[in-house]
């Protein structure tokens, strides 16, 4: 059994300016996206293309800029609407109080989809081509976010057996019983494992939409599994069929990914060009 080490959430204090570990995890996520996006330019069907439909570093920078806005706005709105709609309908101005915390992955995903729609329209590229480019670059950012969750000592897991060697006591959770370190599980599953599988899969030319579909299914399944060990939000608890809100939100992701895969399987192999598919 392990004891959660109290970690100062402030990484660096310069006068009145406090730099938090959680903010640094977001910065790391965006930096990793930029690095991997530039590497992604070497993968088919993006490598070796010239002309108006060719992908460049400038495209990666623009997607990152739009994606940051999508993650922050979508993640915040998703948290407010999916998890505490009654509260924020009564306190609408607190939606903008980002410093109070409260972000939701599924809301951030919707925000990123809107960002990709904007980018695809402005560049006259197929949306699925954009989604295929972005998808393999996302899991490392999710991993960085889970590191931030662990440092903050938040989103801990459900109670674990006292015999579990890596069971961890989060004293600030109000109980001295060991819990599953679900932040670590999610770091390993939806972060590292999903990245390795998706990155290897995306290195070969696939039909347009298949890489994005693999992300939706892969994340949905791995998050669903991880939610089995994560303590449900206290204000929601366990919902219908014994599932958490996170698990319910994963179901449309998985279904959408399967449908997209079936649709993509009927397409011809993807070609990176400027015209719409």
UniProtKB/Swiss-Prot annotation:
InterPro entries assigned to the protein according to its UniProt record, in alphabetical order: Lgt (IPR001640)
Pathway in which this enzyme or protein is active: Protein modification; lipoprotein biosynthesis (diacylglyceryl transfer)
Binding site for a 1,2-diacyl-sn-glycero-3-phospho-(1'-sn-glycerol): 146
GO cellular component, one term: plasma membrane
Topology in the lipid bilayer: Multi-pass membrane protein
EC number(s) given by UniProt: 2.5.1.145
Transmembrane segments: 17-37, 63-83, 101-121, 182-202, 209-229, 234-254
The organism's place on the tree of life at top rank: Bacteria
Main localization category: membrane
GO biological process: lipoprotein biosynthetic process
Annotated signal peptide: none
One annotated GO molecular function: phosphatidylglycerol-prolipoprotein diacylglyceryl transferase activity
Localization of this protein: Cell inner membrane
Keyword set, alphabetical order: Cell inner membrane, Cell membrane, Membrane, Transferase, Transmembrane, Transmembrane helix
Family statement drawn from the similarity comment of this UniProt entry: Belongs to the Lgt family.
Biological role: Catalyzes the transfer of the diacylglyceryl group from phosphatidylglycerol to the sulfhydryl group of the N-terminal cysteine of a prolipoprotein, the first step in the formation of mature lipoproteins.
Protein name, per record: Phosphatidylglycerol--prolipoprotein diacylglyceryl transferase
Organism: Verminephrobacter eiseniae (strain EF01-2)
Gene: lgt
């Amino acid at each position: 059994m392990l004891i959660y080490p109290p970690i100062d959430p402030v990484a660096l204090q310069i006068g009145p300016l406090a730099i938090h570990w959680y903010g640094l995890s977001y910065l790391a996520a965006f930096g990793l996206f930029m690095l991997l996006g530039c590497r992604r330019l070497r993968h088919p069907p993006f490598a070796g293309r010239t002309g108006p439909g060719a992908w460049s570093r400038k495209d990666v920078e623009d997607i990152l800029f739009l994606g940051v806005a999508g993650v922050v706005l979508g993640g915040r709105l998703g948290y407010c609407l999916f998890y505490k709609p009654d509260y924020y309908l009564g306190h609408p101005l607190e939606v903008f109080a980002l410093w109070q915390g409260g972000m939701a992955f599924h809301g951030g995903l919707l925000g990123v989809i809107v960002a990709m729609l904007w980018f695809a329209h402005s560049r006259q590229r197929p949306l699925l081509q954009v989604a295929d480019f972005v998808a393999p670059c996302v899991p490392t950012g999710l991993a960085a976010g889970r590191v931030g969750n662990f440092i903050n000592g938040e989103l801990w897991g459900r109670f674990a057996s006292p015999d579990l060697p890596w069971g961890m006591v989060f004293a600030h959770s109000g109980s001295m019983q060991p819990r599953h370190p679900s932040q670590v599980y999610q770091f390993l599953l939806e972060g590292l494992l999903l990245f390795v599988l998706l990155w290897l899969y995306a290195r070969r030319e696939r039909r347009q939409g298949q890489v994005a579909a693999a992300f939706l299914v892969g994340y949905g399944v791995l998050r669903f599994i991880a939610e089995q060990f994560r303590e449900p939000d206290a204000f929601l608890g366990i919902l219908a069929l014994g599932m958490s809100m996170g698990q319910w939100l994963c179901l449309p992701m998985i279904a959408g990914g399967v449908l997209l895969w079936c649709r993509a399987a009927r397409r011809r192999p993807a070609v990176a060009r400027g015209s719409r598919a």
